[in-house]
Amino acid sequence: MTGPVVVPYGPHADQFLELTLPAGAGPAPVVVVLHGGFWRAAHGVELARPLAADLAGAGWAAVAVEYRRVGAGGGWPATVEDVAAALDALPGLPDAGRLDLSGVTVVGHSAGGHLAAWAAGRGRLPAGAPGAGPRVPVTAAVLQAGVLDLRRAARRRLGARAVQAFLGGGPRRRARRYALADPVRLLPTGAEVLCVHGTGDDVVPPGQSERYAAAAAAAGDRVEVRTVPGGHMGLVDPAGEAWALVRDWLERRRDGRGGRTTLEP
């Protein structure tokens, strides 16, 4: 395992990614890790680093992404534009020959789960929308306690009105922004999806995963929902049960054993 190598994808101090390569010389499957924190500047890429290191140690090329956040130059559309730019930068990385870009997996927790689901649905964005026209196909997404129905999250004022802060207002005032940013509105994505949620999560309710998964399955996407004991932050513990479940799912896909669709835990 080598790295992480820090690569800027834009001029802002928060526009960078960290690439960690697995041992070996051949192309490796790529997993992009998007951290959470309700899109706010208080939390950063340090939340993604342990998961990226674990993935690289298990044979994936891991990419931890930092992006502009609310309170530090982010919000709509800068935050989603950064995620799109980081993904689109992958073919131009110095070690791009070590990356199998035929199908990229995105993993995200909380607001990072929103960004991962949004990245998977970028292909459905209209021309000219922030993030439209992806260069790299996202073929799988792991959504860990994701904020996946932004309108519902806004109505429930999750994260002390974090969605409103991210999008600059509520669904009535910012209807077009919600239409372009809300993962549940960007279906089907064509990506295979795993939603993981803690049964005791009092930060992002499990209903966020359940509603998104039901809509994705109805649209024809392959989706699996798994619930685990515990709360919100346990999902990003690389030694925890929830992450072991994610690793197993990723390994099944890598070995050609994916393709399940179930909405049962």
Go through the PLM ranges and name each one.
Residues 42-52, 63-103:
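Catalytic nucleophile-loop/oxyanion-hole region of alpha/beta-hydrolase
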Residues 202-211:
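Conserved alpha/beta-hydrolase "acid-adjacent" motif
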